[in-house]
Design a protein with these regions (language model features):
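Cysteine endopeptidase catalytic domains of the caspase/legumain-like
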Residues: 1-281
Length: 281
C-alpha cells in the first residue's frame, strides 16, 4: 500500500459579509464521500485531513500541514480547496485562507500548493474557486448524489488498482481550475456549477464505467483527471457558464486517475446470448 495524503480545505469567508459561502463545508463533505468510495480511490479516514472548518485559518498553518506531503515518503497527495479565490494584480492565482479583514486578505499563492522544486512529488490540486481580479462569491455545494450503485464495488481491489496507476506515473503535478484566469466561478441554486457538473458526470457514467470494467479481461477501468477536464469543459462551456482549465507541471506519459475501478475477474463474459469465456484470477 502506498503512502497517500489528502487535504480538504474550506473557507466560506466572514459570516457577516454578503459574500459568505456557508455551504463550503457541505461541499467538502461530498468531495470526501466520493474519494472514500471504491472508484474514487478508497481513501482511508486516517489519510484525510480537513482544514479550516469553524476556525480562522492562516497560510502558515496550511504550510505546516503540508510538510508530510512534500517529502519523498509521500507517494501521492491530493489537495482540494472550496471557497474564495482570485487572480492578484501581478497575475498570480491565489486562494483566500482565513476569514479576511480589510487590513489583511491573507492570500496564499496557488504556487505554494504545487510542490515546485520537488521533482519527486506526485500531486493533484483541485481548486473550486474564482480566478477573477478580486475575490467573488461562489457558493460551494454538491447536490446530494446517489453513489449507492457504485459503492457495492470492492474498495480494496479498486484501491490497489488506483495505487498502481499512481506509481506508474512519473512524479508530476496536475492542477484543475474550475474557471479560467480573470473569470468567476459561479454557483447554482444548490451549489457550484463546477462541483455539480463533476458529480453529475460520476452519477451518469458510473454504469458505463462498470460495463467497461466487466468487459475488460483484467476487470480494469480508469478515467483520468484529463478525462474529467474534457467532460467538465464540454458541459460548462456548452452551457456558456465558465471555462475550466487543466495544467500539468512536469513530464509524464501516465496521468493520475480520477476514477479507478477493478472488478473481480472470476466471472463469465457474455457476447449477446453466447457465453464467450470464463475468466479466472
Amino acid at each position: 500500500m502506498i503512502n497517500r495524503h489528502l487535504i480538504l480545505i474550506s473557507n466560506p469567508g466572514n459570516p457577516n459579509d454578503e459574500n459568505y459561502a456557508k455551504t463550503t463545508e457541505e461541499a467538502i463533505d461530498r468531495w470526501e464521500a466520493f474519494f472514500r468510495s471504491p472508484i474514487g480511490g478508497n481513501w482511508k479516514r486516517e489519510e484525510i485531513t480537513r482544514f479550516g472548518e469553524g476556525n480562522t485559518i492562516d497560510p502558515q498553518g496550511l504550510k505546516r500541514l503540508m510538510i508530510p506531503l512534500n517529502t519523498v515518503q509521500c507517494n501521492y497527495s491530493k489537495i482540494v480547496f472550496c471557497g474564495h479565490g482570485c487572480c492578484t494584480a501581478d497575475e498570480e492565482d491565489a486562494i483566500q485562507l482565513p476569514i479576511p479583514t480589510k487590513e489583511n486578505n491573507n492570500l496564499l499563492p496557488v504556487e505554494d500548493l504545487l510542490g515546485k522544486g520537488m521533482p519527486f512529488v506526485r500531486r493533484t490540486v483541485i481548486l473550486d474557486a474564482c480566478r477573477s481580479l478580486i475575490p467573488y462569491t461562489s457558493k460551494q455545494l454538491f447536490e446530494e448524489r446517489q453513489y449507492s450503485s457504485i459503492y457495492a464495488i470492492d474498495g480494496i481491489e479498486c484501491r490497489k488498482y488506483y495505487d498502481s496507476l499512481i506509481m506508474e506515473a512519473e512524479p508530476h503535478v496536475e492542477i484543475l481550475y474550475s474557471t479560467e484566469k480573470h473569470h468567476k466561478a459561479y454557483g447554482s441554486e444548490d451549489g457550484s456549477q463546477y462541483a455539480d457538473a463533476m458529480s453529475n458526470i460520476v452519477r451518469m457514467k458510473s454504469l458505463y464505467w462498470k460495463a467497461r470494467a466487466i468487459n475488460d479481461r483484467y476487470g480494469h477501468f480508469s478515467y483520468s483527471m484529463c478525462d474529467l477536464q474534457k467532460d467538465l469543459t464540454s458541459v460548462l462551456v456548452g452551457k456558456n457558464i465558465q471555462t475550466p482549465e487543466y495544467k500539468i507541471l512536469g513530464k509524464t506519459d501516465t496521468l493520475f486517475p480520477f476514477v479507478a475501478m477493478h472488478l473481480p475477474t472470476e466471472r463469465t463474459l457474455y457476447n449477446e446470448d453466447a457465453v464467450v469465456e470464463v475468466l479466472e484470477r
